[in-house]
């Protein structure tokens, strides 16, 4: 049975522990395990979580950050949690939530979880980031870590919605879209409903469910739905155009080169591409420089190619200069410009 592993990211004070406690209170079946990472020697959040739900499997990784010094410990911890005996009558663990420190970057954590043993166990990783509707925009502007957490997220949970007016919340959604147009934004004022959305099962191919058409449609809606977003000065959203006749090997080599050039500046990649040597479009996605297995979208109607790259402090010009003969040509873009080009993708 697949196990969902949620990387719960978010800047300092953005409400990660509160969100985690809300999830644990709603888990009447006791199917959730928790790993809490804190950079200091004293694990305050771990104590708070244990006090809020003292019957859950909980491991504290302290005095180090899982995005750097504790990466090998994390893989061992996940394996040990899955192998640990369950109480009599208890169900198997269905999900594990890793609450990261407020200064962690999700990309290296996802890379450390790309472990063959964890893959064999059917671990499915989703990055959920909390976004503080009081200080979120300031944090993203001032701290690289906050921008990286937002840029790598597959889902962004708005917190402290009760402290801001609806128009302010809409402005924060625009900030999020400017950094990461791929993310599903959870902004439900019904807290229980929001928690369910944030920690919903990812499904066999990632957060989108319902087959190939639904998967591709969700990509388009995430990229092009809604009003044009406010661009972040250091986060670049790039659109890619696939060269006619390019093969899968061409694209795979380009992805390797892209990851090498960008390093930890690469935040997200998501694409649906029709290469010359495959009958079906191929779905590609990454968090940071760690790519999931490509997936053929069987049964998807003919469509234009979609390719979006999100990076920090490196833009399309930099990448094109390094890879002038690449099978995918990148250009800096705003949502409105890409939307116009892609308006007939799923007609």
Positions of PLM-derived features:
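C-terminal accessory "lid"/substrate-recognition subdomains
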Residues: 148, 152-155, 161-301, 312-347
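Conserved catalytic-core segment of NTP-binding enzymes
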Residues: 109-182
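A short, charged/proline- and glycine-enriched loop
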Residues: 1-4, 233, 303-304
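Nucleotide-state-sensitive switch-loop elements of NTP-binding domains
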Residues: 2-14, 18-139
């Amino acid at each position: 049975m697949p196990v969902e592993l949620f990387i719960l990211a978010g800047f300092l004070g953005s409400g990660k522990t509160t969100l985690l406690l809300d999830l644990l209170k709603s888990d009447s079946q006791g199917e959730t395990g928790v790993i809490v990472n804190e950079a200091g020697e004293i694990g305050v959040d771990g104590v708070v979580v244990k006090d809020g739900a003292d019957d859950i499997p909980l491991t504290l990784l302290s005095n180090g950050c899982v995005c750097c010094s504790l990466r090998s410990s994390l893989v061992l911890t996940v394996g040990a949690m899955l192998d640990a005996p369950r109480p009599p009558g208890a169900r198997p663990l269905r999900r594990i939530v890793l609450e990261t420190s407020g200064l962690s970057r999700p990309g290296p954590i996802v890379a450390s979880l790309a472990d063959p043993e964890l893959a064999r166990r059917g671990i499915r990783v989703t990055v959920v980031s909390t976004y503080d509707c009081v200080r979120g925009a300031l944090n993203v502007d001032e701290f690289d870590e906050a921008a990286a957490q937002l840029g790598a997220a597959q889902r962004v949970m708005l917190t402290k919605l009760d402290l801001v007016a609806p128009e302010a919340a809409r402005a924060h959604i625009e900030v999020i879209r400017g950094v990461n147009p791929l993310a599903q934004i959870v902004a439900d004022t019904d807290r229980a409903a929001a928690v369910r959305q944030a920690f919903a099962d990812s499904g066999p191919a990632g957060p989108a469910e319902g087959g190939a058409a639904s998967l591709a449609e969700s990509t388009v809606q995430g990229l092009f739905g809604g009003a044009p977003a406010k661009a972040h000065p250091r986060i670049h959203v790039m659109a890619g155009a696939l060269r006619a006749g390019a093969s899968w090997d061409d694209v795979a080599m380009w992805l390797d080169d892209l990851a090498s050039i960008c390093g930890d500046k690469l935040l997200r990649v998501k694409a649906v591409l029709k290469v010359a040597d495959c009958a079906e479009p191929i779905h590609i996605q990454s968090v940071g420089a760690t790519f999931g297995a490509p997936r053929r979208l069987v049964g998807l109607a003919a469509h234009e190619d979609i390719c979006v790259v999100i990076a920090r402090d490196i833009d399309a010009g930099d990448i094109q200069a390094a890879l002038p003969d690449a099978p995918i040509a990148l250009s800096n873009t705003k949502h409105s410009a890409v939307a116009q080009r892609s308006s007939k993708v799923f007609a």
